[in-house]
Amino acid sequence: MTPDPKRVLDAGEVRERLAGGLPGWSLDDDGIHRTIRTAGWKASLMVTTTIGHLAEVAWHHPDLRVSWGEVEVTLISHDVGGVTERDLALATRIDEVVGWRPGDEDGPFTGTPDDPRFAYLPPPGD
C-alpha cells in the first residue's frame, strides 16, 4: 500500500527517516532543512536552478535562500502544515541530483576537473 503523500509525519518519523538516508538534513518547526555548500556564486545559481527544475516537475516547491557559497533549502508541505512523504521524496531527489559526482564512479564521465577554477561543489568532506 502506498503511503498517503499528504499525511503529516510526526517528528519521530521524520527524524528516523533523515537519520536513515538523508544526512545533512535537519528538522525544526519550519520543516526539513539542508545547507548545500557550493564553490561560489555561479555554482549557487546552478544548484538553485537544478532544485527549481526538480521542484517544478514534482509540483512541490521548497523555500530557497541563495548566497555566495551556499544554498539553504527548506521543505514543508504548506497545504497540510507539516512534513510529508512529498518533502522527504524531494529531499532525496535533490541529494541524488545535486550530490552526483560522476568522477567518483566507474563510468563514461570524468566529472569536473580538480582545478579550483572549475569547481562546482566543494570536495566531499570539505
Q: Which residues are covered by each model-predicted region?
A:
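Long, contiguous binding/interaction regions
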Residues: 1-42, 46-126
